[in-house]
Amino acid sequence: MTGPSAPSPPSGPSEPGPVGGPAPAAANAGAPAGAGGPGGGTAVEPRTALHAPTGRSWRAFLQPLAIIAIGGLWMLYVENSDLDSIAARVLAPDYVAQKTWEHIELAVVSTLLVLVIAIPLGVLLSRSWARPATPLVLAIANIGQSAPAIGVVVLLAVTFGIGFWTAIVALVAYGVLPALRNTLVGLQQVDPTLTDAGRGIGMSAARVLARVELPLATPVILAGIRTTLVLMVGTASIASFISGGGLGDLITTGVSTQRTPVLLTGCILIALLALLIDWLGGMAARLLAPKGL
């Protein structure tokens, strides 16, 4: 025997699912903002937020704008200063641009050589059969960075002579460690279950490295490249001691002739160039990092 049943609520075409269930929200998710009742507005919020401008995107460009502003103000100050003939000749725009380009060449060429050496070496040392040699290789790389940079430059100049390529060899010896260590750390922190899954579906060891390990290690490797670039920009100033060129020539000229504006111009330009390279490296890391990491 059944009792009296409760009156059923009126049903309409606007209620495709049970009351309080996910169906109404799913039905209203595609509705435009402000339509579809009170549930529709809540469902649309995440979609609209994806296209709304954020303060973070604007802050990303504050650093290069500040670098350009500081560099422009300093050069404007130098041009309007009362300089003698020596300082005016050294701080001529053409000469400063030439030394800046030489400095960029030193940093970029040395960084490329570091990456050609460090990344393949890091990949090899991350393999199980090569791990016993890892401490020895890292110790050798540590020697290059722990030794005073000026001492390495002078030693190489005595051995191979002075010039651009001697400075490049010194910079490469000084910059291998960050890129090598980051490559090793990035590959070693890959979850072993992911590599086992790749082998389980029939991938070869080379394909697991290319399709699983390297993409997952990319953010750490890119951080090492960024560190190496900034390190090379700062250390390239020592090339002036062996006629390697670069903005270090402004510093040595300013010290030897006791011209403070020349000395400060070299220091400020090197610092601004390092900050600009750091910003470019950060932007490249965001663009090149695999999606979802």
Question: Which stretches of residues belong to each language-model region?
Answer:
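Loop-to-helix entry region at the N-terminal start of transmembrane alpha-helices
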Residues: 98-110, 157-178, 218, 262, ...
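Cytoplasmic-entry segments and transmembrane alpha-helices of multi-pass inner-membrane transporters
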Residues: 121-156, 181-189, 196
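Membrane-interfacial helix termini and adjacent extracytoplasmic/periplasmic loops
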Residues: 138, 150-181, 185, 203, ...
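Faces of alpha-helical transmembrane segments in polytopic inner-membrane proteins
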Residues: 117, 141-149, 169-184, 188, ...
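Transmembrane alpha-helices
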Residues: 173, 205-239, 261, 265, ...
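Glycine-rich helix-loop "coupling/hinge" segments at transmembrane-helix boundaries
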Residues: 158, 235-270, 289-293
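Short cytoplasmic-facing helical segments at TM-TM junctions of multi-pass membrane proteins
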Residues: 179-227, 240, 247-251, 290-291
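N-terminal, non-cleaved signal-anchor transmembrane helix
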Residues: 1-112, 289-293
